[in-house]
Amino acid sequence: MLDCGMSKKYLLEKMQECNVNSKAIDALLITHTHSDHVKQLKAFSHLPVYSVCPLDVGVRVQPYQSFQLNDLKITPLAASHDAEGCCGYLFENEGQKLLYLTDTGYVSKVNLDWMQNLDYYILESNHDVEMLMNTSRPFALKSRIYSDTGHLCNEDCGKILALCAGDNTREITLAHLSEEANTPQKAYDVVKSYLVHYKGLLQVAHQREVVQGGTE
């Protein structure tokens, strides 16, 4: 399981919707220490925990140093966010690769090298810049979100995917959308405009709705 910010009851209900047996979950990976990602750590204390960020529990792993978890090869990729040790994860199994990367203000050249021609991408498309600037949020918060230690906008997400997606890529999911400074349709349209040659599935993860993927 990746992060645990929602209530345990909510998470278990969503697992049921996906026909996932919660008893089959044997580890918890944490991306960073913001409360919306770690609030339920105690509720899942029976699981071994892996993180780059400093926690009171679990195993501390290092960016770009792969480790094995059962049949998964997992590589943490350092993210640029206002939380120590924030990361995304690259998962590899039976020749297929999946990237999960949200909560980052930009994507480094090092990460781009790791992200080339993957089978699956789950990438942040957090905000539309104009919508963000037109919100009633304090300017300091807008600046934080827009900064290199904030979140990826739709345009940057599209540019990154245009650089990375290749012939192996079959599914792209846009994630971590702001409800106030973005819309699913806007995120989809902007990113789609950059993926001129991409023929696979492009979908948007809505908040509080189950999104499933995987073509096999």
Name each model-derived stretch.
Residues M1-C18, G85-D103, Y120:
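Conserved beta-strand hairpin/beta-sheet module of binuclear metal-dependent hydrolase folds
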Residues C4-M6, T33, A79-D82, T102-Y106, ...:
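Active-site metal-binding loops of divalent metal-dependent hydrolases
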Residues S7-V52, D119:
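Active-site metal-binding motif and surrounding structural segment of the metallo-beta-lactamase
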Residues M15-N19, Q65-D71, N111-W114, A162, ...:
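Short amphipathic alpha-helix with an adjacent loop that forms part of the alpha/beta core around
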Residues A24-A27, Q96-L98, Y120, E171:
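Structural motif
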Residues A27, V59-Q62, G200-E209:
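Beta-strand->loop->alpha-helix junctions that form or flank phosphate-binding loops
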Residues P48-Q96:
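Metallo-beta-lactamase
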Residues K109-H206:
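Cap/insert and terminal regions of metallo-dependent hydrolase folds
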